[in-house]
Amino acid sequence: MISNFTGRLLLPKFRNKLCAFFSKESTSSNSLAKSKTNSELEGYTGKSNLLEKKKVGVFGTSTVPINTNFPNPKGVIGYDPDFSVKELVAELPNTRKTQGAKLAEEIKDAFSNISIEKPELLEDIGFVRHNEARVEYKFDTSEKLDLWKIGCDSDWKEGFSTCSLVNSDRGTAVFSGNISTRVLKDGRVERAGWASMKLEDRKTFNRKKFLSKWRNFSHLLLKVRGDGRSYKIMLHSPLSMDFTWGDSFSHPLHTHGGPYWQYEKIPFSKFFHTVAGRIQDRQYRVNLEDTSSIGIVLMDRIDGDFKLEIDYIGVYNDTTHVEDFAYETYTLPVFNTHGF
C-alpha cells in the first residue's frame, strides 16, 4: 500500500492536485488571520512615540555633533542628527541673539580682567593657603540654575524614570524625581533606572570651559542635604578623539538623610577612571586641565522617589593631603594583544 501511494505521488496529475489543495488551504487560513487581525485593531488609535525623532538644536543641547565626521558622540543606536534648512533658518535669530550676548560678555570680561597680577600663576607657585575654600557654583538664581541640564532614561525613550531641578525658597537647588527600574520591552534596553544633572557651562559657539583653575586644590567640596541614597559625582573629561568621549572620573556621594546639611570633601586623588560609567582596569589620576563638566548621577537600582538639595559646589585645599592617587592599576605585559 505504501509503495502504491508513493507511486501515485510521483504522478504529475496527482501531484498538481495535491499542491492546489494545500495552496487553497493556506490562502484561506491567511485571509482568516488577516480578517481577525483587522477586527482586533479596528478602533485602535493609539500612537507609539518610541520612534519619534529627537529635536536637535544648533547650540546649547547635548546632541550637538562634536565634529562633522562623528555626529553621534554618545553612540546612541538609531540616532539621526539631521535637521532641515527650514528649522535652521527659524533658529538662527535666537541663536544670533544668545551667542552675540555671550560673545559680548566674554570680550568685556577679557578686557576688564587685564592686570599685572595673575591669580592662577600665584596659586601655581603655592599661594593657596591651608583650609582655603572657594565656592564655584551657587544655585540662588534662575540664571545660575540654567547652567545645569537634567536627564533620565525616559528622555531617551529607554525607561520610565522622571527628574526635575528647581530653585527652593532658601536659594538652593532641589534635584528630585522618581527612579523606575522597569525595563522597556523593546528588545534593546537591558536595564533602566537612572537620573542625572550635569553642568553645561560653555563659551561662545559651544566652546568648552575647562576646570583647570581647580588644579591647585586638593578636594572637591559640596554642601548637600540628601535622602539617604547613594549618588555618584562625575568629572567629565572628553577630549577631541572619539574614543575619549565617554571618559570621566567618578566617586560615590553617600547622603545621610534627615534635616541636617552635610559638607562633603572628596579628594581628587580618590576619583577613579570610568568610561560611560564603567570602571576601567587601567586607572590614573584625574587631570583637571581636561575636565570640562561635573555631574551628579543616581542609579542605585532602587525604585522610588529621590530628593537631593544642593547649596553649593566648590573646591577646598588641604596641604596635609599628600596622596597623589589612591588606587592601583593593572599593568599589561609587554607583549599583549593591545600592543606596547
Swiss-Prot record:
One of its GO terms (cellular component) is mitochondrion. The keyword Nucleotide-binding does not apply. Keywords: Chaperone, Mitochondrion, Transit peptide. It is found in: Mitochondrion. Its main location: mitochondrion. One of its GO terms (biological process) is mitochondrial respiratory chain complex I assembly. Chaperone protein involved in the assembly of the mitochondrial NADH:ubiquinone oxidoreductase complex (complex I). Required for normal growth and reproduction. This is Probable complex I intermediate-associated protein 30, mitochondrial. The gene is nuaf-1.
